[in-house]
């Protein structure tokens, strides 16, 4: 080695140590920010999941797949929801606007020969929008609520209530 010239390896080493330290610190920072703890089941839901649409403290999922009514109920349960009911004219208009084309199962069923309609939770349907048809299971058509045989395949709409 020649006299008076700085050593190249020590200069590189002094540059690598700070750069390496910065990379390690940034990596740890990214890992900390990107990992989230699981949400405990007793925590309230404050926002809609990806693929769901929010309206009036509810989240709605509009399916593209078709199932019979009982499978539609199960699919909603698998997503921690239930088939939607209709609670107001405004909700009815919102759902019609977002559901797209086709018929969609909702959570209203006829429970007796007198034409009494009940929601999935067992409460009475308030006939906010009259249900037309002769079937036992209600669905949304393009403009109204209709009824048909429960075994027929249709799209479906799930709802999760934000707490």
Swiss-Prot record:
SUPFAM superfamilies: C-type lectin-like. The keyword Disulfide bond applies. Disulfide bonds join 76-158, 137-150. Transmembrane segments: none annotated. Keywords: Disulfide bond, Lectin. Residues 48-159 form the C-type lectin domain. GO terms for molecular function: carbohydrate binding. Pfam families: Lectin_C (PF00059). The keyword Disulfide bond applies. This is Putative C-type lectin protein FPV239.
């Amino acid at each position: 080695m020649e006299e008076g010239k700085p050593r190249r390896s020590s200069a590189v080493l002094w540059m690598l140590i700070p750069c390496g330290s910065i990379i390690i610190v940034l990596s740890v920072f990214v890992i900390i920010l990107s990992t989230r703890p699981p949400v405990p089941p007793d925590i309230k839901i404050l926002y809609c999941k990806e693929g769901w649409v929010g309206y009036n403290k509810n989240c709605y999922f509009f399916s593209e797949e078709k199932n019979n009514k009982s499978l539609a109920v199960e699919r909603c349960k698998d997503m921690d929801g239930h088939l939607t009911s209709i609670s107001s004219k405004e909700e009815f208009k919102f759902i019609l606007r977002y559901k797209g084309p086709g018929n969609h199962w909702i959570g209203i069923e006829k429970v007796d020969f007198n034409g009494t309609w009940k929601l999935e939770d067992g409460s009475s349907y308030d006939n906010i929008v009259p249900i037309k048809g002769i079937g036992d299971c209600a669905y949304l058509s393009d403009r109204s609520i209709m009824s048909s045989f429960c075994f027929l395949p249709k799209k479906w709409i799930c709802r999760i209530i934000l707490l």
